[in-house]
């Protein structure tokens, strides 16, 4: 009987601690700042996404980088390569329409142009 009460008390305590940890979790200030700017600005969705991506990628998480061990350096290099790839893709021009790709392209099939 005593062990059942003890188990119930420990279960209740763990639930209370879990709920307290969730409500006390810090929010990301960059996310809050981005949301405020996106509501205030009347820019297009693509510009906001590029801005947010650039802002996230410009500030690497220093706490993770400080705790790296030598075997984790290869993973850090891969993450840096992925970050550079994302920056390049964010800065690249959007896909052009088929007509803008090649001006001399006259291949078409049933009123639609094809990529030459």
From Swiss-Prot:
Example GO molecular function term?
A: hormone activity
Q: What keywords appear on the UniProt entry?
A: Amidation, Cleavage on pair of basic residues, Disulfide bond, Hormone, Secreted, Signal
Ranges for the region named Disordered are 62-99
Spell out the GO cellular component terms annotated for this protein, sorted alphabetically and separated by semicolons.
cytosol; extracellular space; GABA-ergic synapse
Please list the disulfide bridges: 105-116
User: Is Disulfide bond tagged as a keyword?
Assistant: yes
Propeptide ranges, please? 25-88
Q: Name one GO biological process term.
A: somatostatin signaling pathway
Q: Coiled coil: which residue ranges?
A: none
Positions of post-translational Alanine amide modification: 43
Q: How is it modified after translation?
A: C-terminal amidation of the neuronostatin peptide is required for its biological activity, including for the regulation of mean arterial pressure.
Report the locations given in the UniProt record.
Secreted
What Pfam families does the record point to?
Somatostatin
Extent of the signal sequence? 1-24
Q: Which family does it belong to?
A: Belongs to the somatostatin family.
Instruction: Please give the name of this protein.
Output: Somatostatin
Q: Which organism is it from?
A: Sus scrofa
The organism's taxonomic lineage, starting at the top: Eukaryota, Metazoa, Chordata, Craniata, Vertebrata
Q: Which gene encodes it?
A: SST
